[in-house]
Amino acid sequence: MLFRVSLLELSLTEWFRLLMKRKTIYILLIVACLLISLQSICQITNTSIKGFIDVRSMYDNNKVSFGLGEQDLFITSELNDRFSFLGETVFKFDSSSFTDFSVSIERIVIKYNIQGNHNLIIGKIHTPLNYWNDTYHHGRVFFPTIDRPLLFQAEIIPLHTIGAGLQGHDFGKLRFGYDFFVGNGIGAGPVSDNDKYKSVTAAVHIKPVDNMRIGLSYYNDVISKGADVEGKIINWKVNQQLTSGSFAYFGKKVELLAESTFGINRTDTTGTKHTLASYVYGGYKIKDKFIPYFRVDNLAYQNGEIYFTKNNTTAIVVGMRYEINFLAVVKLEYQYTHSELNGINNKVTAQFAIGF
């Protein structure tokens, strides 16, 4: 009886606090149940969920800045002995977003093992045109340098393709591998193509010795007049061919990566124009955790180029990488850049990248 009276005598504020406490308990119970369910599902399907992030400080244009890099959510799952899934979602800065950040679906890949090392892949992939794009995802902790080479920033190669293809690896003594992919072309959206043309990617590689890979690739696409490519409207129909070659060696002491892409863009108005984008990276492990490195980039465009933004550029990067462990890396580097449009630029960047 006394308990009932005390409840009646509670103030409105006290009632609200009591309800909020109970609501909090209910929410915590629901979250706990969801986590237990998710853990059970992950165990059944052998699912792995990982994250990657980097923070950096940069001295550029006579000022010091601090910034956040991309936050990468990386999910892999083995559904059974033949089907597997890979998903990669990135949260990154976007000046047009109300929150200054946006979500980008970078990869959704469903893989079916046909037989042995032959696989059928469907979804959104990293276009396998060179070693860097085929090997590294958006987790900066694995990059040998702070950022990608300039040919990526200049959008020389299409980073992603949505479609279907075949993939195989590690055949014979040379450990031969191949990729053949047909997908939506440049300018297509995430749910449909913008024209009737399809892009074709064909790539082969060998691994003659441990830690070495030599590759060659070819890409062909027709970009329709009026296509929106990264915010740029293409005013001509462009027939594009890209041929890339790469050499990669990451040994116990020496690291070497050299890649080059030769682009041919042809229109009925301007004819055929050539572009050559290349870079060379080298590193040497002086101790177990310290790797000094360099990278030289070069972008060379033919006069009259109308698809790529013509900006002949040379850049030199020198830096030091300290590997705290497999999932924590500190990098410090200096970059000198001389470009046709922006002149000379010098900057120093420090980065701390982790995986978790």
Residue ranges and their predicted role:
Residues 19-28:
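Bacterial N-terminal signal peptides that target proteins for export
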Residues 37-38:
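N-terminal signal peptide c-region/cleavage motif recognized by signal peptidases
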Residues 44-185, 196-198, 205-214, 281-284, ...:
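Outer membrane beta-barrel
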Residues 45, 54-61, 90, 97-98, ...:
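Outer-membrane beta-barrel pore domains
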Residues 187-202, 225:
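Surface loops at the rim/top face of extracytoplasmic beta-rich domains
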